[in-house]
Design a protein with these regions (language model features):
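Catalytic cores of TIM-barrel enzymes
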Residues: 1-475
Length: 475
């Protein structure tokens, strides 16, 4: 009986969430906290425990799902498993308990301009073959264990490859049972699936650093644009391979520094947006929504986002003005978030409740709104304010009219027929590192089923491809 009850709860929550994301009017405002280290505080764990042991991060989420009436949340919003990053020897993380105190969130340590992971003169190498560049140049620079090209291979080099790849497989495989546990034990929806980042954000985050990229935009913008174009097919491919097979929950894009004043409006319009918009459109053509997790203030770019197909995105409010976002985007796209993290950390619960009520009664008055904090909730938010946001949503978020039916999810094209040429005909092709056409020249004539040999080669090649790209995107 309990199993049936949880399944009914899950079905109702999923309908509520999907209805809102497709701009419908559900029975009430769905609640979807992107709760990271705050879950550790609720569960009695330290930041070190939920960052270095993903099983404890999973358990912290389950305890929150049990104790709060959330419609959806992320299976592990801490996400970066520092056991894996240590196995790969990654230099750019401050690990709780090792590099920073045990109850401090992990830190990303961007290198100085002089020690950037990609040098300015290496743009052509990245453009010519992104995957080869990642393995031969980028990986040895970001890791203390992997050897540079031309160096003698070491024991630590070989061990790092084996440990980190097996750790990645273990970690990603564990998400399936975690999502099922959320559904079975708590009736809670896993809020997102997959991952996307803008090409220009990747250049700044993992290759050139912000300072280096800023100078490149001013001095060699053509090379920056070519690099972004070279990354596009791979980022689109990665997003599609991780998307929800049912096309119910969105693919998130973590938008870091693509807004003014980090870059100029000119560079947004000439580089950032032209190399991101086609990816979002390609995902939508396959029936996948994208969650624009717009970190920072994006008011200057809302009109550009409004040119996307209706319902194709969910726009998340960090520091974007909620009223302006609703005016420009609210007729086409669902909005989410808007509860300032500083208020969740320092305000009294009554003030948090008032903020939630205002959001519901203004931008959420006609549906198409999902309650959440402005940014990922780390360990600075208080449990009292987390409860206040939850309770206020249930109290003020009930709509007067009956729930509208869940809108039909756009049908996905068969196979990859709907993918544009810039993905399917990219050279090198997304999804492989060493193409079969190259490998077959090293082999004797194939006997028996040649297509079987090619298929198995491509499938296993895909694992090597996913490994390096997830080091870039996920870790």
């Amino acid at each position: 009986m309990l199993q049936t009850s949880k399944e009914e709860l899950y079905t109702a929550r999923l309908k509520r969430y999907v209805t809102a994301m497709h701009l419908g009017l559900p029975d009430r405002v769905p609640l979807r906290p992107f709760a990271a280290e705050i879950t550790a505080r609720h569960a009695g764990f330290t930041c070190q425990e939920v960052t270095h042991d993903y099983r404890k991060a999973f358990e912290a989420i389950i305890r929150c799902c049990h104790d709060y009436d959330w419609d959806a949340t992320v299976a592990n919003m801490v996400y970066v498993w520092t056991g894996l990053t240590q196995a790969a020897g990654l230099k750019y993380y401050g690990v709780p308990g090792i590099d920073v105190p045990a109850d401090v969130c992990f830190q990303y340590c961007e290198p100085a301009d002089q020690t950037a992971f990609m040098k300015r003169e290496e743009y052509d190498d990245l453009i010519a073959d992104p995957v080869r560049f990642l393995y031969e140049t980028w990986l040895p620079r970001v890791s203390s264990d992997f050897c540079e090209r031309g160096q003698a291979v070491t024991f630590r080099n070989n061990l790092a490859f084996v440990k980190s790849s097996m750790a990645m497989m273990e970690y990603f495989t564990a998400f399936g049972p975690q999502v099922e546990r959320m559904r079975r034990e708590c009736g809670t929806v896993s809020a997102i699936c997959g991952m996307l980042k803008a090409p220009l954000d990747i250049l700044g985050d993992k290759f050139r650093g912000y300072v280096g990229l800023a100078f490149d935009l001013m001095e060699i913008p053509d090379k920056v644009q070519q690099a972004c174009e070279a990354l596009m097919p791979h980022l689109a491919y990665l997003a599609l391979t991780g998307a929800d097979p049912q096309r119910e929950v969105p693919i998130p894009i973590w938008m870091h520094r693509g807004c003014t004043p980090f870059i100029s409006k000119q560079h947004f319009k000439s580089i950032y947006w032209p190399t991101l918009k086609p990816i979002v459109e390609a995902l939508w053509a396959q029936g996948n929504q994208t969650l624009f997790y717009a970190e920072g203030k994006w008011d200057a770019h809302l009109e550009d986002f409004a040119t996307l197909p209706e319902h194709s995105i969910v726009y998340h409010l960090d520091r974007t003005t909620p009223e302006r976002a609703h005016e420009i985007l609210g007729r086409k796209f669902c909005l989410s978030g808007g509860v300032p993290n500083v208020k969740l950390a320092f305000a009294k619960p009554e003030e948090v409740r008032a903020i939630c009520r205002k959001l519901i009664e203004t931008i959420g008055a006609e549906g198409g709104y999902v309650m959440d904090a402005s940014a990922i909730m780390q360990n600075d938010a208080t449990l009292e304010n987390l409860k206040a946001m939850t309770d206020a949503t249930h109290e003020y978020g009930v709509y007067r009219s009956a729930s509208s039916p869940t809108p039909a999810i756009p049908a996905a094209p068969t196979a990859t027929a709907g993918l544009p040429d810039w993905i399917t005909q990219a050279v090198p092709r997304p999804g492989v590192c060493c193409p079969w056409a190259e490998k077959i020249r090293e082999l004797p004539p194939i006997q028996g089923d040649a297509q079987l040999a090619k298929r198995v080669w491509d499938d296993i090649e895909g694992l090597g491809y996913l490994y390096i790209w997830h080091l870039v995107l996920s870790f």
